[in-house]
Amino acid sequence: MSVVAAKVYEKEIIMAADSILVKGWSKRNSNFAKIAEINDMIVGGTGSAQEMSMMWHYMQTHKPASASEKDVLTFIIEFSKWKGDMGGGSNLENAYLLAYKEHLFEIEYMFVHEISDYVAIGAGEDFASAALYLGHSPQEAVKVACDLSCYVCEPIIEYKMAKENNQ
């Protein structure tokens, strides 16, 4: 139960996420965020908090060889194997957005796709995608999802990655 939205601008990539944490049918008040900046990457995830924690731990010492779909897929495959070795099962449960070296990627299971405009994932993705389509920022898009979906809630966390080459 989450929403993560991101948008590629001329000079930066902006990613925002809600902060809901659910256990069973109960919402937990917590400071657990679904988005983090680690090792020169910004990653936002939806799904299992356990898998997200494992991803963040893995990212401390690993990153893709380059900002290409192929190398991000290799990174995800290696994470999946590592996760299995750690006892978390090797199948990926979560969807992720990854900003790396001025590029934005959507990751769903073993599918990696570079995003050139905007994207949203999670329970509030339809609301957030509509807001992004209408020209709103990722933070505004997540706010719309928080207002309209019972599965996501504030506070909203936002990270930015500058595009030095202004591609």
Regions found by a protein language model. Give the residues of each.
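Short hydrophobic alpha-helical segments used for membrane anchoring or interfacial signaling
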Residues: 97-101
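Short arginine-rich
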Residues: 147-156
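Positively charged, Gly/Ser-enriched RNA/tRNA-binding surfaces
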Residues: 105-113
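Conserved short S/T/G-enriched processing/targeting/catalytic segments and their helical context
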Residues: 1-92, 112-139, 153, 161-166
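Short polybasic amphipathic segments
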Residues: 94-96, 156-157
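Low-complexity, intrinsically disordered Gly/Pro/Thr-rich segments
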Residues: 141-147
